[in-house]
From Swiss-Prot:
<dbReference type="InterPro" id="IPR012340">
    <property type="entry name" value="NA-bd_OB-fold"/>
</dbReference>
<dbReference type="GO" id="GO:0019843">
    <property type="term" value="F:rRNA binding"/>
</dbReference>
<dbReference type="GO" id="GO:0000049">
    <property type="term" value="F:tRNA binding"/>
</dbReference>
<keyword id="KW-0699">rRNA-binding</keyword>
<keyword id="KW-0820">tRNA-binding</keyword>
<keyword id="KW-0689">Ribosomal protein</keyword>
<dbReference type="Pfam" id="PF00164">
    <property type="entry name" value="Ribosom_S12_S23"/>
</dbReference>
<protein>
    <recommendedName>
        <fullName>Small ribosomal subunit protein uS12</fullName>
    </recommendedName>
</protein>
<keyword id="KW-0694">RNA-binding</keyword>
<comment type="subunit">
    <text>Part of the 30S ribosomal subunit. Contacts proteins S8 and S17. May interact with IF1 in the 30S initiation complex.</text>
</comment>
<comment type="function">
    <text>With S4 and S5 plays an important role in translational accuracy.</text>
</comment>
<comment type="similarity">
    <text>Belongs to the universal ribosomal protein uS12 family.</text>
</comment>
<dbReference type="GO" id="GO:0015935">
    <property type="term" value="C:small ribosomal subunit"/>
</dbReference>
<comment type="function">
    <text>Interacts with and stabilizes bases of the 16S rRNA that are involved in tRNA selection in the A site and with the mRNA backbone. Located at the interface of the 30S and 50S subunits, it traverses the body of the 30S subunit contacting proteins on the other side and probably holding the rRNA structure together. The combined cluster of proteins S8, S12 and S17 appears to hold together the shoulder and platform of the 30S subunit.</text>
</comment>
<dbReference type="InterPro" id="IPR005679">
    <property type="entry name" value="Ribosomal_uS12_bac"/>
</dbReference>
<dbReference type="InterPro" id="IPR006032">
    <property type="entry name" value="Ribosomal_uS12"/>
</dbReference>
<keyword id="KW-0687">Ribonucleoprotein</keyword>
Amino acid sequence: MPTINQLVRKGRTPKVKKTKAPALNGSPMRRGVCTRVYTTTPKKPNSALRKVARVRLNGGVEVTAYIPGVGHNLQEHSIVLVRGGRVKDLPGVRYKIVRGALDTQGVKNRKQARSRYGAKMEKK
């Protein structure tokens, strides 16, 4: 417990909140260029080939971003929009690529949660 004199001299410092997506620099989303598109395997109890991409963001920072949904059209030099959001079973993947924005196409034949995957309403 500090004395009043100590509080007058130093004051209380507010706690600094650490950001979960530092490469975005406080922006909700950032544009970038794919430098490598590949698959990785998840952590222990799970088994799959998860689609990820190395993306060089506008600020020059390179991050690993997850490509959500079934199938994608991304390759090297594709321009993508990256948002925050980690993938729990892929260590080091703290960003996701926005489907249906810039060079990324939306998921085909998607019926539910379409807006998350950039899928248009199906014509009757």
